Amino acid sequence: MARVKRGVTAHAKHKKTLKAAKGFYGRRKNTIRAAKAAVDRSKQYAYRDRKVNKRNFRALWIQRINAAVREFGLTYGRFIDGLNKAGIEVDRKVLSDMAIHEPAAFGALVEASKKALAYLKEAGTANEFESAVR
């Protein structure tokens, strides 16, 4: 069996790892063993934080919607409840964007939500409301 010399592939692999570790502090940027450990850990953080990022953005959208809705005298939970009962399906990202950039359109949604909540209070049941809306 022929001898395999790994000089070229090993050098390429090391170069790839060191390129990924560029910008790291201290030994982690120029020593292969430390750089490999640091790059592996950074990939773990990146994987985890892609999930965390989604949670953080959803929380931010909810805070923005809550702040905008309180100007109309509603809470976030009541507003979402009213939208669901009115049959309006708009996701939180769009609602947050509307609250910031299109206050008039957002106000119309708040009024629709209030109307649905008030009508439901009068009607008594959700089934009566559904038949009245259609």
UniProtKB/Swiss-Prot annotation:
GO terms for biological process: ribosomal large subunit assembly; translation. GO terms for cellular component: ribonucleoprotein complex; ribosome. CDD domains: Ribosomal_L20. It comes from the Bacteria. InterPro entries: Ribosomal_bL20 (IPR005813), RIBOSOMAL_L20_CS (IPR049946), Ribosomal_protein_bL20_C (IPR035566). Disulfide bonds: none annotated. GO terms for molecular function: rRNA binding; structural constituent of ribosome. Keywords: Ribonucleoprotein, Ribosomal protein, RNA-binding, rRNA-binding. Gene3D superfamilies: 6.10.160.10, Ribosomal protein L20. Belongs to the bacterial ribosomal protein bL20 family. Binds directly to 23S ribosomal RNA and is necessary for the in vitro assembly process of the 50S ribosomal subunit. It is not involved in the protein synthesizing functions of that subunit. This is Large ribosomal subunit protein bL20. The lineage of its organism: Bacteria, Pseudomonadati, Pseudomonadota, Alphaproteobacteria, Hyphomicrobiales.
